[in-house]
Swiss-Prot record:
Pathway assigned in UniProt: Carbohydrate biosynthesis; gluconeogenesis
Cofactor requirement: Mg(2+)
Enzyme Commission identifier(s): 3.1.3.11
Gene from which this protein is expressed: fbp
Localisation: Cytoplasm
GO biological process: fructose 1,6-bisphosphate metabolic process; fructose 6-phosphate metabolic process; fructose metabolic process; gluconeogenesis; sucrose biosynthetic process
Name used for this protein in its record: Fructose-1,6-bisphosphatase class 1
Length: 280
C-alpha cells in the first residue's frame, strides 16, 4: 500500500503546483451527478489518472468526475476512489480546497477501506495520511512531505460546520443546530467539506453535518469519494460518525459508485447529542 500512497503524494504535489496559475473558468461539461465541471476539476482528474495509472499496485480507480470505474491492472489488489478537487467552486475566491482519496482492497466498500488521505491546498501544502492513526504531513522547501504530528479528537469541541440549504432542513435538524449555538458553538462552514473536516480535526473537535433535506433526501455528499474516507479518518482519530440513524457511516453499503448519504462527523459529545435529537 505504501507504493499507492507514494503515487498519491506525487499527484497531490503536481496539483498544488498547477494551482499557482489556475484556469478558474467553467467547462461545458457536467459530471455524473450533474455538477458543471470547472476546467481545473478536469485537469486535477487528469493529473491523478495519469499518475495513478503508473502504479502497478492499483487495480482500478473511481473518480467523482468519471461515470464508471476505470480498470488499470486486474491482477493488482487496491482500488483508489477520489474526489480530485473538493471545494473547487471556491477557487474563484481563493479559499482552501483539497483532494480526498480512499484506498480499498479488492472491492470498493467501507469494510474494505484500508487507508484514507486528503490534501489541503492552502497557505501551505499539507497531507493527512491515515492507516491506523491520522498523521499530518507538510511539504518543506525540498519538496518533501515531513511528519508534523498525530491527530486526535477531543471528547467535545466548539466548532459547528453545518451544510445544506436551511429552508429545506427538517425541524429536528434545525432544533439540533440551534441547541449547539445556544451552548456557545462557533459557526465555521466554508462550503468545502475537506476544509471543514480538516479544521475540526486539527482544532480537536466539533461537528460537521450535511443532513437529509427536502431537496436532497439522500444527502448530497458521495459515499465512496468523500464520506467513507473522511469517516475513516475521523473515527481513527477517536471521533464518531453517523447518518443520523446508525452508529457509524462505515456500516453503510451501496451498490452505485456515485451514491450519496446524509452524514455527520464529530466528537463523541456532538454525535451522541445528534443521535439523541434525531431519534427521540
Amino acid at each position: 500500500m505504501q507504493e499507492v500512497i507514494s503515487y498519491i503524494q506525487k499527484a497531490v504535489l503536481e496539483i498544488s503546483n498547477a494551482l499557482k496559475f489556475p484556469d478558474t473558468s467553467y467547462s461545458q461539461n457536467q459530471n455524473f451527478t450533474g455538477d458543471t465541471q470547472l476546467k481545473f476539476d478536469v485537469l486535477s482528474d487528469e493529473i491523478i489518472t495519469k499518475t495513478l495509472s503508473q502504479c502497478s499496485s492499483i487495480k482500478a480507480i473511481i473518480s467523482e468526475e468519471k461515470d464508471e470505474i476505470l480498470t488499470l491492472n486486474e491482477r493488482a489488489n487496491f482500488i483508489v476512489a477520489y474526489d480530485p478537487l473538493d471545494g473547487s467552486s471556491l477557487m474563484d475566491v481563493n479559499f482552501a480546497i483539497g483532494s480526498i482519496f480512499a484506498i480499498y482492497e479488492e472491492k470498493a466498500s467501507a469494510k474494505n477501506l484500508r487507508a484514507a488521505l486528503y490534501s489541503m491546498y492552502g497557505a501551505r501544502l499539507e497531507l493527512v495520511i491515515c492507516k491506523d492513526q491520522p498523521k499530518l504531513y507538510r511539504l518543506n522547501a525540498n519538496n518533501e512531505f515531513i511528519f508534523i504530528k498525530d491527530l486526535r479528537m477531543n471528547e467535545k469541541g466548539k466548532i459547528n460546520a453545518t451544510g445544506g440549504t436551511q429552508k429545506f432542513w427538517e425541524e429536528k435538524h434545525a432544533k439540533f443546530i440551534k441547541s449547539l449555538f445556544d451552548e456557545g458553538y462557533r459557526l465555521r462552514y466554508s462550503g468545502a467539506m475537506v476544509s471543514d473536516i480538516n479544521q475540526i480535526l486539527l482544532k480537536g473537535g466539533g461537528i460537521f453535518s450535511y443532513p437529509a433535506t427536502q431537496d436532497a433526501p439522500n444527502g448530497k455528499l458521495r459515499a465512496f469519494f468523500e464520506v467513507f474516507p473522511l469517516a475513516f479518518i475521523i473515527e481513527k482519530a477517536g471521533g464518531k460518525t453517523t447518518n443520523g440513524k446508525n452508529r457509524s457511516l462505515l456500516e453503510l453499503e451501496f451498490d452505485k459508485i456515485h451514491a450519496t448519504t446524509p452524514c455527520f462527523f464529530g466528537s463523541e459529545y456532538e454525535i451522541s447529542k445528534l443521535l439523541k435529537a434525531y431519534n427521540e
